[in-house]
């Protein structure tokens, strides 16, 4: 569905046009699940696992809000830190998503348009087929684009297209020098931005 949506729109989502979340998550849940239940007389409480420290926009969200039409949003972990989430996993003997021990700061889409430089490098090192898939998608979406080009990440001084961004992800000092230290490290070893390997 994601590739089809991008081809239909002739572009990839961006931080200002996050149609991926809107059309592939929010709208599907509303129209296929929540509205039919409301039509049957049910009230909906939508439990959402968003945390305030994930972004400035999420920090502004209330813990609970009634959005009308019989729907209330409830964000029980809004004030939690990432560490609080992992502590709750461990308290109940639930293993976190294994991607968190492979250098990923977020899981869901791979890569997410919000992934950072280190995460992009980790994806390229551990999952090179994902990078090839994105390159293929860029060609497909680019063919449908009015501009004749489409990239998952914004094209700027870092480069144009996933392959150039992966090369940039291997650099330090403003993208001018390759960071050689990771080349000496075991890429299959545990790596966590949340300290899960200690």
Predicted regions and their residues:
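Nucleotide-activated chemistry modules centered on ATP-dependent adenylation/adenylyltransferase
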Residues: 1-198
């Amino acid at each position: 569905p994601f590739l089809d949506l991008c081809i239909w729109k002739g572009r990839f989502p961006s931080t200002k046009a996050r149609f991926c979340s809107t059309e592939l998550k929010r709208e599907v849940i509303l129209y296929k699940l929540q509205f039919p239940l409301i039509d049957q007389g049910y009230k909906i409480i939508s439990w959402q696992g968003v945390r305030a420290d994930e972004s400035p926009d999420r920090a502004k969200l209330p813990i609970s809000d009634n959005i009308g039409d019989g729907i209330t949003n409830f964000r029980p972990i809004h004030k939690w830190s990432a560490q609080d989430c992992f502590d709750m996993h461990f308290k109940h003997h639930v293993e976190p998503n294994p991607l968190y021990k492979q250098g990923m700061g977020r899981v869901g889409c791979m890569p997410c348009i919000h992934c950072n430089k280190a995460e992009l490098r980790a994806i390229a090192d551990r999952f090179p087929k994902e990078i090839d898939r994105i390159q293929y998608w860029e060609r497909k979406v680019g063919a449908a684009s009015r501009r004749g080009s489409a990239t998952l990440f914004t094209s700027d001084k870092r480069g144009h297209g996933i392959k150039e961004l992966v090369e940039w992800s291997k650099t330090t000092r403003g993208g001018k020098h390759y960071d050689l230290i990771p080349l000496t490290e075991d890429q299959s070893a545990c790596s966590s931005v949340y300290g899960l390997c200690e």
